[in-house]
From Swiss-Prot:
Pathway: Carbohydrate degradation; glycolysis; pyruvate from D-glyceraldehyde 3-phosphate: step 4/5. It comes from Clostridium botulinum (strain Langeland / NCTC 10281 / Type F). It is found in: Cytoplasm; Secreted; Cell surface. The active site is at E208 (proton donor), K340 (proton acceptor). This is Enolase. Its EC number is 4.2.1.11. It catalyses: (2R)-2-phosphoglycerate = phosphoenolpyruvate + H2O. One of its GO terms (biological process) is glycolytic process. The gene is eno. (2R)-2-phosphoglycerate binds at Q166, K340, R369, S370, K391.
Amino acid sequence: MKNYIEIVDVYARQILDSRCNPTVEVEVELEDGTVGVAAVPSGASTGAFEAVELRDGDKSKYLGKGVLKAVDNVNTIIADELVGMNVLDQVAIDKTMIELDGTDNKAKLGANAMLGVSLACAKAAANSLGMSLYQYIGGVNAKVLPVPMMNIINGGKHADNNVDLQEFMIMPAGAPSFSEALRMCSEVYHALKSTLKSQGYDTGVGDEGGFAPNLKSNEEAIVVIIEAIKEAGYTPGKDIFIALDPASSEIFEDGKYNLAGEGRVLTPEEMANYYVELAEKYPIISIEDGMAEEDWDGWKILTEKIGNKVQLVGDDLFVTNTERLSKGIKLGVANSILIKLNQIGTLTETLNAIEMAERAGYTAVVSHRSGETEDTTIADLVVAVNAGQIKTGAPARSERVAKYNQLLRIEEELNDMGEYRGLKAFYNINK
C-alpha cells in the first residue's frame, strides 16, 4: 500500500445549503489524479462555544451570509501550506491548519474553511486507496450500523410554531437491522402525517424534514407520535422509543427556562422535574440539551435524577470540544455527547472527542446540522467509529435521505460483518 500520496491542489467554492444559505465546498486533488470533495453544513441553533463559522457580513449579498472569505482562505493561505503534503497524514494536515489559524475557536480561517479541507483530504485519500471512507477512517473493525435518532416533529428554532422544545424524535432500537429500522421510521413518518391531517393540523415540514404542526403543548407532540407508532403497527417502548432535543439554551433567560408556548417559567430544578415526569409517563430513551450550555448546576441535577435510565446528550454543552467534554466528565454531568464536525472544525479533533467520550463511558451520537448538503460524510463517520447512533433528520428532504441511503449502501457492503446493536448502543444507561 502507498504510504505517501502528494496533495497537488486544494480548491474551494461557494455553494448553497438546504436552507438556501451559502456554504463551503472543497476539492482536494492528488498526484495520481484522484479527487476528494466535501461540503460543510451549518446550524440554526448554535452553541456559544462552537468554532467560528466565517461569514462575509456583506448585507448586499446573501443577507451577509456569504462565505467568500472562507473560500479565499482555502484557496490561498491553506492551499499554500497543504500542497506538497502527504494526504495520508490526516493528523499533520489538521495540525497544520490549526497552527495556521492560531486562535482557540478557528476565528481567523473559519471552521467552515478548515473542515471542508479536512474532510476533502480524507475522502481523497480513501478514493486514492480504493477504500470506502468508513474503512479508511475506522480501519478493519468499522462495522456498527447506527440506530437512527429521527426528527419527526419540529419546534423551537427549527419551525414557525408554538412548540418550545426543538425536536421530537423516534429511535427504532428494537429493530433487527439498520434497513429494518429505516423502514419502521418511514412507516411511522407516514402514519404521523395521516394522524396530524386527521386532527386538522398542518403537515408542512421544518428544516430537518420533520412536521411543524401548531400543537397545543410539548406533551401533545409526544402523544401524537405515540399514536403514530401504534398506527404503524409498532409498540412504543419496545420497538420504537422517543428522543427529545429541547435545545434548552434557546429558552434559558435570567437563570430560568421559559416555556412560552405553555405559559410557564421554570427553575433548573423544576425543569429537571418536568423531564422526570415525561420520562416516567412516556418511553423516552434520550434527551439532548435538556439544560442550557452554561447551566452546569442544572445539568448536574438532571443527571442525578435520571442519568441512570435516560441518555442525556450534551450538544451546546460540549460542542464536540474535548476541553468542555473533559469538564463535563469530571463534574459527572450528562452521559453522552453529540458529535457535529463543524462545531470543532477538523476530522482529527472530532475523532479525539469521540475517543474521550467512549473512554469515559459516554455514548457518541453523530449528527447533521439543520443547514445540510448532499454530502454524506457523517454516514461513513458513524460506522467508522462504531458510535451506534446517528441523528440526521426525518426520512424526507433529499439532504437528509442522502445520509440514510449511504448507510443502506454501507450495510449492504458490510453484509454479514455489519452489526446493528439496537438497545445495546445505549451502554450508558440501564435499560
